Amino acid sequence: MKKQIYTLFFLIFFFSCNDTAETFLSLKKNKVNVRYGPSFDSDVKYVYKKINLPIKQIDKKENFRRIIDMKNNSGWIHLSQLKNNNSVISTDLKILYKKPSSFAKPIAQLKKGRLLIVKECKKKWCSVETGKFTGWVDKENLWGISK
């Protein structure tokens, strides 16, 4: 009996831990409709007009994903308009460095709200591209990536 109780607690703990992982996605197109509900019959709530914009998935129903953006706008988007996340948004003034170190040569200053395309990430740093600049930025104050 004790063994069954311990097994039950373990399974509950294991599955509850897996549900806490954040899922970020990016917009696949330049124009994406966000709907009130998970159906093409639902009215359009608003339209995103920014390809690669990162969004956070908070629910799913069939081929629709309920999302929330950096400004807490939420709604439903069809899966065909989404892709695996490849971008982040700077939530504060940031410095883009040549190498993944705050002692490296600064390349550019990134303003709050800047969309960055992620090339790769290491522990505390991500290699990003924005406009004509490519470099490294620390993960702190970036929205759209699991820490």
Question: How would you label these PLM feature ranges?
Answer:
Residues 20-33, 38-50, 54-62, 68-108, ...:
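Boundary regions of SH3-family modules and the immediately adjacent low-complexity/disordered segments
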